[in-house]
From Swiss-Prot:
NCBIfam families: PRK13183.1 (NF009650). InterPro entries: PSII_PsbN (IPR003398). Its main location: membrane. It comes from Synechocystis sp. (strain ATCC 27184 / PCC 6803 / Kazusa). It is a single-pass membrane protein. The lineage of its organism: Bacteria, Bacillati, Cyanobacteriota, Cyanophyceae, Synechococcales. GO terms for biological process: photosynthesis. This is Protein PsbN.
Amino acid sequence: MESATVLSITFAVILIAITGLAVYTSFGPPSAELGDPFDDHED
């Protein structure tokens, strides 16, 4: 394959992996450990 094609596929896979990890952290089981800054701050 062309090196540009391999580079494009590699970049796309890395981008999808980072997006999947962010969605998993935001909405999956690890989200129970996330704090809400609005609840933590009292005016």
